[in-house]
C-alpha cells in the first residue's frame, strides 16, 4: 500500500516541500536561515496574537495597556519582550539570509529573489508600524519623522501624508490604522513566504560551490530537518538569553516615556535594524534625494542579478569579490553605527562616505571584479 503522505493531496504538498525534497548534499549552516525566518515568523504571530488580546489602540490608553501587559497579565512581560526581541532576531536572520544570497549567487533564481525583496519590504513596514504601537516618545516621533518623508514627493506629498495620518498630525486615527496593518501584514508575509518557497522548489536550492547538484541530491528529511531543529534551538537559546537577561538592550529608553507631541526627544532614531538605511537617508542634504536614496538602498537588491558579470555563480572561488563582499558588510556595520549618532560633525561626513561606498561597491566595483576574475581565469 502506498504511503499516505505520498497520496493524500494535502500531505503530498508537505511531503514534497519538507520530507522527500531533493536537497544538495553540501549546503552549509548558511542555508539554515530560511527555516529560522519561518520559526521567527510563527513566533511573532503567536506572541503578537496574545499581545493583541490585551492591547488597546487608543492614544489615551495604548501606553498604559502595554504597562498593564507587563505588570498584570500572567507572564505578559515574557510575551512582550519575546515579541520585541523576536523582531531583532527576525532581522538578524533576514540580513544573514540576504547576505548568503549575495555571497553564493542565489539571486540568479530571479523569481525567488524578487519575492524575497517584496518580503523584505513587507517585514520592514510591519516592524516600523509595530514600533509605533507602544505609544512612547520614540514611537510617536519615529512615526512623525518617517511618515513625513512622504511629503518630499512632488505635488501630492502633503496630501498623501495627511491621508496616511488620518488628520493633520500623528494621532488616534494613525495609531488605530497602524495597529490594523500591523495585525494583518504578518499573514500576508506568511502567504508571500509560501510563494517564495514555491518558486524555490521549482529550481531547487543553490549550494556553496555554485555548481548544479542534480547528480548529488539527498532527501531533506532526516538530514536537514535535524540541522534545522539544531538551528531553531540555538535561535531559541539566543532569544531566551536576550529576553531574560537584558530585554531592553536593543530598545530605546525614550520609549518608556509616554508620547508627548510638545516635547521632542534629543535624538530621534528608529530601531537598530533600520539604522543603516536611516544613515543613508540623512547623509543626503536634500529631502527628496534622501528619500530616494533610502528606498534605493533596499531596492538596489533587485539590480544585483542584472549586474552579475562573473561566469561563476557564487563567490566561493572569487577572492576579489570576497574582499568586496566583506568590505560591504563592514560598510553596513559602519552605517548602522552612524545611524545611531547625532547629526553633527564628524558623523555626517562619515555617513556620506559610507553611503557612497555602499552604492559604489554594489553598482560599480562588484561587476568590475567579476570581469577581472573572468579575465584572470582566461574565460
Curated annotation (Swiss-Prot):
<feature type="transmembrane region" description="Helical">
    <location>
        <begin position="320"/>
        <end position="340"/>
    </location>
</feature>
<dbReference type="GO" id="GO:0045275">
    <property type="term" value="C:respiratory chain complex III"/>
</dbReference>
<keyword id="KW-0349">Heme</keyword>
<keyword id="KW-0830">Ubiquinone</keyword>
<feature type="binding site" description="axial binding residue">
    <location>
        <position position="97"/>
    </location>
    <ligand>
        <name>heme b b566</name>
    </ligand>
</feature>
<dbReference type="Pfam" id="PF00032">
    <property type="entry name" value="Cytochrom_B_C"/>
</dbReference>
<comment type="function">
    <text>Component of the ubiquinol-cytochrome c reductase complex (complex III or cytochrome b-c1 complex) that is part of the mitochondrial respiratory chain. The b-c1 complex mediates electron transfer from ubiquinol to cytochrome c. Contributes to the generation of a proton gradient across the mitochondrial membrane that is then used for ATP synthesis.</text>
</comment>
<feature type="transmembrane region" description="Helical">
    <location>
        <begin position="226"/>
        <end position="246"/>
    </location>
</feature>
<feature type="binding site" description="axial binding residue">
    <location>
        <position position="83"/>
    </location>
    <ligand>
        <name>heme b b562</name>
    </ligand>
</feature>
<keyword id="KW-0496">Mitochondrion</keyword>
<dbReference type="InterPro" id="IPR036150">
    <property type="entry name" value="Cyt_b/b6_C_sf"/>
</dbReference>
<dbReference type="InterPro" id="IPR048260">
    <property type="entry name" value="Cytochrome_b_C_euk/bac"/>
</dbReference>
<keyword id="KW-1133">Transmembrane helix</keyword>
<feature type="transmembrane region" description="Helical">
    <location>
        <begin position="347"/>
        <end position="367"/>
    </location>
</feature>
<feature type="transmembrane region" description="Helical">
    <location>
        <begin position="113"/>
        <end position="133"/>
    </location>
</feature>
<dbReference type="InterPro" id="IPR005797">
    <property type="entry name" value="Cyt_b/b6_N"/>
</dbReference>
<comment type="subunit">
    <text>The cytochrome bc1 complex contains 11 subunits: 3 respiratory subunits (MT-CYB, CYC1 and UQCRFS1), 2 core proteins (UQCRC1 and UQCRC2) and 6 low-molecular weight proteins (UQCRH/QCR6, UQCRB/QCR7, UQCRQ/QCR8, UQCR10/QCR9, UQCR11/QCR10 and a cleavage product of UQCRFS1). This cytochrome bc1 complex then forms a dimer.</text>
</comment>
<keyword id="KW-0472">Membrane</keyword>
<feature type="binding site">
    <location>
        <position position="201"/>
    </location>
    <ligand>
        <name>a ubiquinone</name>
    </ligand>
</feature>
<keyword id="KW-0479">Metal-binding</keyword>
<protein>
    <recommendedName>
        <fullName>Cytochrome b</fullName>
    </recommendedName>
</protein>
<feature type="transmembrane region" description="Helical">
    <location>
        <begin position="288"/>
        <end position="308"/>
    </location>
</feature>
<keyword id="KW-0813">Transport</keyword>
<dbReference type="GO" id="GO:0006122">
    <property type="term" value="P:mitochondrial electron transport, ubiquinol to cytochrome c"/>
</dbReference>
<feature type="transmembrane region" description="Helical">
    <location>
        <begin position="178"/>
        <end position="198"/>
    </location>
</feature>
<dbReference type="GO" id="GO:0008121">
    <property type="term" value="F:ubiquinol-cytochrome-c reductase activity"/>
</dbReference>
<dbReference type="GO" id="GO:0005743">
    <property type="term" value="C:mitochondrial inner membrane"/>
</dbReference>
<keyword id="KW-0812">Transmembrane</keyword>
<feature type="transmembrane region" description="Helical">
    <location>
        <begin position="77"/>
        <end position="98"/>
    </location>
</feature>
<dbReference type="InterPro" id="IPR016174">
    <property type="entry name" value="Di-haem_cyt_TM"/>
</dbReference>
<keyword id="KW-0249">Electron transport</keyword>
<dbReference type="InterPro" id="IPR027387">
    <property type="entry name" value="Cytb/b6-like_sf"/>
</dbReference>
<dbReference type="InterPro" id="IPR048259">
    <property type="entry name" value="Cytochrome_b_N_euk/bac"/>
</dbReference>
<feature type="transmembrane region" description="Helical">
    <location>
        <begin position="33"/>
        <end position="53"/>
    </location>
</feature>
<dbReference type="InterPro" id="IPR005798">
    <property type="entry name" value="Cyt_b/b6_C"/>
</dbReference>
<keyword id="KW-0999">Mitochondrion inner membrane</keyword>
<dbReference type="GO" id="GO:0046872">
    <property type="term" value="F:metal ion binding"/>
</dbReference>
<keyword id="KW-0408">Iron</keyword>
<feature type="binding site" description="axial binding residue">
    <location>
        <position position="182"/>
    </location>
    <ligand>
        <name>heme b b562</name>
    </ligand>
</feature>
<comment type="similarity">
    <text>Belongs to the cytochrome b family.</text>
</comment>
<keyword id="KW-0679">Respiratory chain</keyword>
<dbReference type="InterPro" id="IPR030689">
    <property type="entry name" value="Cytochrome_b"/>
</dbReference>
